């Protein structure tokens, strides 16, 4: 991961961010720092601080991380997530922490992720959300959710409150045959696991950032229909009651006006599965806003 950050072309140059990117995105209502691992960027603290100083009040700023960050980055995130950081600036700040399976991470690194998660949640219970990649019907999804639930219980989450775990199916990438994907035929099996986990953990909710494939619920039983209320899509929209599906006009596909991805060179893409299809470069526009995104 450190090699990726230090490889030319793999991470955004700070001067390019400051001079060419930030002036064009600072009025956007939502900015996410993604990776790789953004917290390993040698100028991460400068990048985050300059974004906070230039963003408009009532906008949203997010950090996508695997939790394996240096102490100086964690210290800044703890300051930012607290009342004297983003809250004082009236910016809604959140950390999205990708929770790995043990086949993808060492015991030592897994403990570091737990340490980071607990520190951020202690500072602000709404400042962090766990994220799971759905890539196989054989993955240890039950173990992942048990570990996350244990963290919330250790921190004393009140019994009348719920927490959301972001889930992201491994979709195919257009033009790339190498990436690992969750086959559509396995969606019902993974969905069955998710239903069982909702039954086991009453405070758990699942959140799909974008579309919700209905076949995830192919194996649901009628007495389990109320559990669907704890599944969200398009960010925070609850999946409608299954009994209303036959009589309602539903759209469960891609969200409108999804954020535009910008790579280290400033090339722009509409969303991750289409990142091989370049739409333009950020330097083509004086400002990135809703109109420029629609134009692209």
Residue ranges and their predicted role:
Residues 245-249:
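Short, P/G- and charge-enriched loop/turn segments at secondary-structure junctions
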Residues 179, 251, 276-279:
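Generic secondary-structure boundary/loop-capping signal
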Residues 14-34, 41-183:
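Radical SAM/AdoMet-radical enzyme domain recognition
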Residues 262-263:
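Short, acidic, Ser/Thr-enriched surface-loop or helix-capping motifs
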Residues 188-244, 267-296:
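C-terminal accessory region of radical SAM enzymes
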Residues 1-12, 271-275:
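Canonical Radical SAM [4Fe-4S] cluster-binding loop centered on the CxxxCxxC motif
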Residues 253-257:
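Short, small/polar residue-rich loop motifs at catalytic or cofactor-binding pockets
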Residues 38-40, 270:
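Proline-centered helix-kink/hinge sites
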């Amino acid at each position: 991961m450190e090699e990726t950050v230090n490889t030319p072309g793999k991470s955004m140059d700070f001067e390019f961010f400051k001079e060419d990117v930030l002036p064009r995105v600072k009025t956007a209502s939502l900015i996410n720092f993604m990776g790789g691992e953004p917290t390993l960027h040698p100028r991460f603290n400068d990048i985050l601080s300059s974004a906070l100083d230039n963003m408009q009040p009532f906008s949203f700023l997010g950090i996508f991380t695997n939790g394996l960050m240096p102490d100086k980055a964690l210290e800044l995130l703890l300051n930012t997530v607290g009342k004297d950081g983003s809250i004082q600036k009236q910016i809604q700040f959140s950390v999205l922490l990708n929770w790995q399976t043990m086949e993808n991470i060492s015991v030592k690194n897994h403990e570091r992720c737990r340490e980071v998660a607990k520190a951020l949640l202690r500072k602000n219970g709404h400042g962090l959300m766990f994220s799971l990649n759905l890539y196989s019907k054989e993955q240890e999804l039950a173990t992942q959710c048990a570990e996350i639930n244990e963290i919330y219980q250790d921190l004393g989450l009140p019994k009348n409150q719920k927490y959301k775990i972001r889930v992201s199916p491994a979709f195919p990438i257009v033009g790339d045959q190498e990436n690992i994907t969750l086959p559509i035929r396995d969606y019902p099996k993974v969905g069955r696991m998710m239903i069982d986990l909702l039954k086991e953990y009453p405070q758990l909710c699942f959140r799909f950032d974008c579309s919700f494939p209905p076949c995830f619920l192919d194996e649901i039983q009628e007495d389990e229909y109320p559990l669907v209320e704890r599944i969200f899509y398009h960010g925070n929209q609850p999946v409608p009651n299954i009994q209303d599906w036959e009589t309602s006009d539903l759209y469960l596909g891609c969200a409108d006006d999804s954020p535009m991805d910008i790579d280290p060179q400033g090339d722009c893409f509409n969303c991750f599965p289409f990142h091989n299809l370049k739409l333009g470069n950020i330097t083509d526009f004086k400002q990135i806003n809703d109109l420029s995104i629609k134009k692209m």
